[in-house]
Amino acid sequence: MDIIFEQALFPLFCFVLSFFIIFFTTTRPRSSRKVVPSPPGPPRLPIIGNIHLVGRNPHHSFADLSKTYGPIMSLKFGSLNTVVVTSPEAAREVLRTYDQILSSRTPTNSIRSINHDKVSVVWLPPSSSRWRLLRKLSATQLFSPQRIEATKTLRENKVKELVSFMSESSEREEAVDISRATFITALNIISNILFSVDLGNYDSNKSGVFQDTVIGVMEAVGNPDAANFFPFLGFLDLQGNRKTLKACSERLFKVFRGFIDAKLAEKSLRDTNSKDVRERDFVDVLLDLTEGDEAELNTNDIVHLLLDLFGAGTDTNSSTVEWAMAELLRNPETMVKAQAEIDCVIGQKGVVEESDISALPYLQAVVKETFRLHPAAPLLVPRKAESDVEVLGFMVPKDTQVFVNVWAIGRDPNVWENSSRFKPERFLGKDIDLRGRDYELTPFGAGRRICPGLPLAVKTVPLMLASLLYSFDWKLPNGVGSEDLDMDETFGLTLHKTNPLHAVPVKKRGRN
């Protein structure tokens, strides 16, 4: 009887148990948020995290790690969470899709040491009214299409001076430091736009000192620094970046303040009723904004803005021309093609003008190929997440530092055929430009943080390069063969050749 009773109750017990299981599993509250994983990354050591995995060229280290951990990976540098993206798709997410969330910066220890992060258009967050003012001034008074067109003759004249200097070196059969010569050209272009004066002189060592100072700024900002990962070490300045940046920036500030003081003195002496026939430059516009009870700027703001503009307008342009010349000397057949195109278009006119560049597609391809292999800022300027954000299915937490490794994207064999080869032909017939719309080639960044100096760079670099190729043939000094040309890099905010390129200009018959 008991057995029969148990047999009868057992199915009922199972039914009731099943009912409660189904009821509680289907009616209990569930989290509305899905669990989003962090990007994959290498194992971390206590305290230092992944610092030990980064060598003297972080863009190389990140590229190697991405082969194991994928196009979006997570790293830890001391106390600093870092995400590195290494594909066009991931770059689009960071630079465009989530541009607003990922548009702040994490100032470096050296930048904070001169309070540059509080006034700089590079380091201020876009939510800042000061950033919006400085960005607007740069866009409308410096780099607008109208201003770029208005300074065309200036750029052409400064490049003519470069060619003249090269001609003198050619007559003496002397090798030229390409980096230094093109830096002086870029320096005089930007200094005339800003101050209406030349700051560089091809026959003076002072120009070399100025270049070394600008490079010192870029390296002090871009070099690895223990205090960026462990803020409590900042006062020790273990790598010397704070000391270097303070010394270099103060030398530049002294130059800038000298021009500002001279302009203010000139302004005070000038009769307000007299007609000012001198063409106004950018600093004149800035000084107008320092006047009155509701002044929008002060002179300290101006010198810090000028520091940003000199870095963006000189070192990056000259280093790109140097890399282009180095690649052409390593690939003589490519140089011959570029020169043949230029000779065909320019003929015996004797000079390359900016209006000629649009008729030189192969030259433009050479410039793009140079930016692909040697982007001026290989990791761009790192961004910071203002809030948690999901990128390609992975969670990027608030305050994470985000790098876009444009150097690695430019050499990705999944994106580029024969990715390590210098081959300008890959761009012919393709609508790929440098203006932040094609994420396989974004050397200037994209979105609201795109480099404001891009319009000037895309005019200056091709003009300098075309003029050098039109007026001269080129050879390496001391019998060095093209296959022996050193292409080592030195990492900083700007990517330089470790050993500056020296080449001998050989004047073409009937030129200059």
From Swiss-Prot:
What SUPFAM superfamilies does UniProt report for this protein, alphabetically? Cytochrome P450
Q: Which residues does the record give as heme binding sites?
A: C451
The induction comment states: By ethylene, abscisic acid (ABA), wounding, lead, dark and infection with the bacterial pathogen P.syringae pv. tomato.
Q: What is its EC number?
A: 1.14.-.-
> What stretch or stretches form a coiled coil here?
none
Q: Which CDD domains does the record associate with it?
A: CYP76-like
Please give, as recorded in its UniProt entry, the membrane topology of this protein.
Answer: Single-pass membrane protein
Tell me, in one coarse class, where this protein mainly resides.
membrane
Give Gene Ontology CC terms.
membrane
**Class of the enzyme per the UniProt entry, highest EC level:** oxidoreductase
* Cofactors (names): heme
The signal peptide here is none
Q: Which InterPro entries match?
A: Cyt_P450, Cyt_P450_CS, Cyt_P450_E_grp-I, Cyt_P450_sf
Q: Which GO terms describe its molecular function?
A: heme binding; iron ion binding; monooxygenase activity; oxidoreductase activity, acting on paired donors, with incorporation or reduction of molecular oxygen
What the entry lists under PROSITE patterns is as follows: CYTOCHROME_P450 (PS00086)
Tell me which Pfam families the record gives: p450 (PF00067)
Q: Which residues cross the membrane?
A: 3-23
Q: Which domain of life is it from?
A: Eukaryota
Kindly state which keywords UniProt assigns to this record, in alphabetical order.
Answer: Heme, Iron, Membrane, Metal-binding, Monooxygenase, Oxidoreductase, Transmembrane, Transmembrane helix
Where does the record say this protein resides? Membrane
Q: Which family does it belong to?
A: Belongs to the cytochrome P450 family.
Protein name as annotated: Cytochrome P450 76C2
Organism, by scientific name, is Arabidopsis thaliana
